[in-house]
Design a protein with these regions (language model features):
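Bacterial N-terminal signal peptides that target proteins for export
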Residues: 1-10
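Bacterial N-terminal signal peptides
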Residues: 9-18
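C-terminal/domain-edge helix-coil "capping" segments
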Residues: 25-54, 141, 154, 158-318
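Short beta-strand->alpha-helix linker/helix-N-cap micro-motif
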Residues: 30-33, 45-119, 131-140, 159-160, ...
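Sec/Tat-exported extracytoplasmic proteins
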Residues: 62-65, 81-85, 89, 126, ...
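Surface-exposed short loop/turn segments
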Residues: 112-149, 154, 251, 258
Length: 318
């Protein structure tokens, strides 16, 4: 009888352990992650526990612009937010690969886009107290607008709908606007050393970011050689960009790609030189005071994510 009495508590502890971020926070959906997602779906009806306290899951942002070239931002925006929030100790952020694995098990494919109305279900499966997602749109060439929505998973209550817009070259600033608004809405404690990390953008180079996002998507689709090429291109554009170096190293460690000397040298150089040269300048300092009336309403936008110009053929000289 004693075991029956404490069985619900034991189940809660097990589920919390399984849904907590692991020590290997990579970008590859492994066999173990897929098995976790399958088990969560199998046990969905028996999940009676409340969401894990201070746990935050960020879904992919849906591209509503009608421009396929902007699709890399769907995972890219979530990727940057997850990476930033993972440095804040007062909140537990669900790994991106767990969302990806769960979405695939739900039959949503490698895109990982959650169907409207199913967010609370996904939040429960991820054992997340809070859930955020959003849409990407725009009205003019190169003008970007990102509208997000922050939910309390258990009640589906909307906590806030922060938004930001700007030129495509300001993507790093747009992400930071949403980041600090989430922190404010959830009243998260951020220590000074954490704030210093949060103020550092993933990259200010739009080409580097585009390649990074495409690399992550290629990896999700199982095209690891293409992912490697995108990561290397990203690092070539900006050696200090976030995630790309670790993602490239992960592909090598898991023996998913053919390792060439160039790749080994690139990863080695990144290990030996850590730079903070991407720190925001005073002119780019982010505003951290927000007011409810300042939050823009949702609009539809058309934006084209710039592709790198094609290289002209080299003329042979006699």
């Amino acid at each position: 009888m004693g075991i029956k009495k404490y069985f619900p508590i034991i189940c809660s502890i097990v589920i919390l352990f399984m849904t907590a971020p692991s020590s290997r926070a990579g970008q590859i959906v492994t066999k173990e992650t897929r098995e976790w997602a399958q088990q969560m779906l199998q046990e969905e009806k028996s999940l009676q526990t409340a969401p894990a306290r201070n746990t935050f899951a960020i879904l992919y942002f849906k591209n509503r612009s009608g421009q396929a070239d902007l699709d890399p931002l769907q995972k890219g925006m979530a990727l940057m937010l997850i990476t930033d929030l993972s440095t804040v100790k007062s909140v537990q952020v669900v790994e991106r690969i767990k969302l990806q694995a769960l979405a695939e098990e739900l039959g949503l494919g490698a895109s990982g886009l959650i169907e409207p109305g199913t967010e609370p279900r996904v939040g429960k499966l991820l054992s997340a107290q809070w859930l955020a997602g959003g849409e990407i749109s725009g009205t003019q060439q190169s003008l970007l607008r990102v509208q997000s929505r922050l939910l309390e998973t258990a009640t589906s209550t909307i906590i806030g709908q922060p938004a930001s817009e700007g030129m495509l070259a300001e993507l790093f600033r747009i992400e930071k606007d949403l980041l600090f608004e989430f922190i404010k809405l959830l009243n998260l404690e951020v220590k000074p050393d954490e704030m210093a990390k949060l103020e550092k953008p993933c990259s200010k180079n739009s080409k580097a970011l585009s390649a990074l996002f495409r690399g992550v998507d290629a990896s999700d689709r199982g095209d690891y050689e293409k992912a490697k090429d995108f990561y290397e291109k990203s690092l070539k554009e900006d050696p200090d960009i976030c995630i790309a170096g670790e993602a490239l190293q992960e592909l090598q460690d898991l023996d998913l790609i053919s390792v060439k000397k160039r790749s080994r040298d690139l990863v080695r150089s990144l290990r030996e030189s850590t730079s903070l040269t991407n720190q925001l300048t005073p002119k780019e300092e982010l505003k951290k005071k927000f007011y409810p009336n300042d939050i823009p309403t949702k609009t539809n936008v058309d934006v084209i994510f710039p592709l790198p110009p094609s290289t002209p053929p080299v003329k042979k000289t006699k």
